[in-house]
Amino acid sequence: MKRNDPCWCGSQKKWKHCHYPTKPERPSDNLRQLYASRYDIIIKTPDQIEKIRKACQVTARILDALCKAAKEGVTTNELDQLSCNLHKQYNAIPAPLNYGQPPFPKTICTSLNEVICHGIPNDTPLQNGDIMNIDVSCIVDGFYGDCSRMVMIGEVPEIKKKVCEASLEALNAAIAILEPNLPLYEIGEVIENCAARYGFSVVDQFVGHGVGVRFHENPYVAHHRNSCKIPLAPGMTFTIEPMINVGKKEGFIDPTNHWEARTCDHQPSAQWEHTVLITDSGYEILTLLDN
């Protein structure tokens, strides 16, 4: 967005005469007040952004270590114990632990094969041919980071490889279009188009979300086609986490634990996730490892 373009807020003024920031990545108080009152969205201050960035880097490091440890024969409970140790090492708090109702019982989510999201670690060993999403959310000094990745165990069937590839491609394509003034619905458009090229479906029961000051904030970021016209603005932080199914988009919540979401047709599902920051000129992926 250029200085002489119309401002994203709809005032019909040029951006430079309206919400153009006086300093890089320092949105005006008027912008924060507008987004808080109109959309209940927290536009972060430079100090908050720096603390969220730190939390996101810790989250990414823990996720990276867990992905490297996920091998055939390892149980997801063993990964959860490693997660506990890593959180202590980084002086971080696992955000999922005891979250919600019923309280989530583990420090990470491990979603295998047909589990769409919110998989609960257990004592079943990982097997050759499994795919798994590991989702890590950390609290560091009171601020939150959130990211996830797919891992493939041993020799994985081609269709499972394809759905992992499609989800990552959809995430990267959605991130690539981010900039101030972009309406939120464009994210869902890009993801739907990407999934369609593979012949896969996009889960619409779960969404991305604002994150940083709280675990879950506005805006909710739909990965499917939608009509949300909220314009992105510098200082917004949120997750993009497309869940792509090989078969039908519908899922159901496991009635035995009230957390795990599974595909209704038991076909594989895949998800990748990053926390992103909207900047004055585009975006920053906060959960991208700095090394």
Swiss-Prot record:
Keywords: Aminopeptidase, Hydrolase, Metal-binding, Protease. One of its GO terms (cellular component) is cytosol. Binds 2 divalent metal cations per subunit. Has a high-affinity and a low affinity metal-binding site. The true nature of the physiological cofactor is under debate. The enzyme is active with cobalt, zinc, manganese or divalent iron ions. Most likely, methionine aminopeptidases function as mononuclear Fe(2+)-metalloproteases under physiological conditions, and the catalytically relevant metal-binding site has been assigned to the histidine-containing high-affinity site. Pfam families: Peptidase_M24, SEC-C. A divalent metal cation 1 binds at D135, D146, E273. Its cofactor is Co(2+); Zn(2+); Mn(2+); Fe(2+). InterPro entries: Creatinase/aminopeptidase-like (IPR036005), Pept_M24 (IPR000994), Pept_M24_MAP (IPR001714), Pept_M24A_MAP1 (IPR002467), SEC_C_motif (IPR004027). Gene3D superfamilies: 3.10.450.50, Creatinase/methionine aminopeptidase superfamily. One of its GO terms (biological process) is proteolysis. Its EC number is 3.4.11.18. Belongs to the peptidase M24A family. Methionine aminopeptidase type 1 subfamily. This is Methionine aminopeptidase.
